[in-house]
């Protein structure tokens, strides 16, 4: 959930759209690939199934410098939620850490005491996102003959201390 595990560089080469050797601190994820491809091809999603990512095309074209929606991560019951400069980390269902990624790149200064109310709000949003992922994993967003390939391993309970 920390930057050493989820914060890695990405590379895009597109000579007619991107200035060579340009860089950005835009936060993105593989969740963004599908919406970006759909946007690049100028097509619409076939229905109203939930999509967790955002199109990176506005960033690529220089129209956006920061992410328009939060970026969620989940792994074996742990979660991270990046929204603007803040990163919220939920471990083991009850430990909350908050870091300002712009000012604290190495995630050493835990700001949880300064953002306790915001942490509760984000906790609720993570649980809503987790519920949406769980429903989708169970087939709720697909045809009735869908069978999940493995057991759901998301978050069953998050608490804020």
Predicted regions and their residues:
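Short Gly/Pro-enriched turn/cap motifs at secondary-structure boundaries
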Residues: 1-3, 71-72, 78
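Long, internal low-complexity/basic segments
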Residues: 33, 101, 106-161
């Amino acid at each position: 959930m920390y930057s050493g595990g989820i914060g890695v560089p990405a590379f895009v080469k597109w000579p007619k759209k991107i200035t060579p050797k340009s860089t950005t601190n835009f936060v993105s994820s593989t969740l963004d690939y599908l919406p970006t491809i759909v946007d690049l091809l100028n097509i619409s999603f076939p229905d109203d199934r939930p999509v967790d990512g955002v199109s990176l095309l506005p960033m690529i074209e220089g129209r956006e410098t920061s992410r328009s929606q939060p970026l969620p991560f989940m792994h074996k019951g742990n979660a991270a939620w990046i929204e603007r400069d803040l990163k919220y980390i939920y471990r083991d269902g009850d430990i909350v850490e908050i870091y300002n990624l712009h000012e604290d790149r190495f995630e050493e200064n835990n700001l949880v005491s300064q953002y306790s109310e915001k942490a509760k709000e984000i906790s609720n949003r993570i649980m809503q996102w987790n519920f949406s992922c769980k429903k989708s994993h169970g087939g709720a967003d697909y045809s009735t003959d869908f069978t999940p390939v493995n057991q759901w391993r998301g978050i069953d309970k998050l608490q804020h201390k």
